[in-house]
Regions:
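Acetyl-CoA-dependent GNAT
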Residues: 4-7, 18-28, 32-95, 103-108, ...
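Hydrophobic pocket/interface hotspot
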Residues: 13
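Conserved active-site tyrosine of GNAT-family acetyltransferases
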Residues: 17, 64, 136, 141
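Glycine-rich phosphate-binding loop
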Residues: 100
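Conserved GNAT acetyl-CoA-binding A-motif
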Residues: 113-124
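Terminal substrate-recognition subdomain of acyl/acetyltransferases
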Residues: 157-168
Length: 168
């Protein structure tokens, strides 16, 4: 089941975000940097995001426990059209990887973006994050290699690429 996030969900979202990021970025980011990821800082971020709907946040729930989340809204890219949405973040608890949670969250985000009038959607993914690249490609996204850029994550430079697909 996927539903809109409430303020009470911020801590669980932050925990999943932190644990999943530590698992995903292991080997891409130095371990000492990964240890500095803070549930408290992420909780404050997601609490504010939920309160102000920027981005919109949905959670996947199994047996009354949050097992994943997605944040989505209009694209933050400067030159994007107003009809382009963006997946800002999509994470499942590592215990729920490859169990359909991500696809359920993607479906909810797609529906939400479609309701907002979006016709395309993008996502920025680290080039070395094979799991995320496979997931997005399985969901119909295509890499736009000309968009590759360097982002700083926890003080470490990471190469990212934008992926894009039509909403329908």
């Amino acid at each position: 089941q996927v539903r809109p996030a409430t303020l009470r969900d911020a801590k669980a979202i932050a925990q999943i975000h932190t644990i999943a990021a530590q698992a995903v970025y292991k080997g891409l980011v130095p371990d000492d940097q990964l240890k500095t990821l803070s549930v408290e800082k992420r909780q404050a971020y997601w609490r504010e995001a939920i309160e102000y709907c920027e981005p919109q946040v949905q959670v996947a729930v199994e047996d009354e426990k949050i097992v994943g989340f997605v944040g989505f809204d209009r694209s933050r890219d400067e030159k994007s059209r107003p009809t382009t949405g963006e997946i800002w973040a999509i994470y499942a608890a590592p215990t729920h990887w490859s169990k359909g949670v991500g696809l359920a969250l993607w479906d909810a985000a797609r529906d939400g973006l479609q309701e907002e009038g979006c016709t395309n959607v993008t996502a920025w993914v680290p080039l070395r994050n094979e799991r995320a690249l496979r997931f997005h490609e399985m969901a119909g996204f295509k890499r736009e290699m000309s968009t590759a850029k360097t982002a700083v994550v926890g003080g470490v430079k990471i190469e990212e690429v934008r992926l894009k697909r039509p909403i329908n």
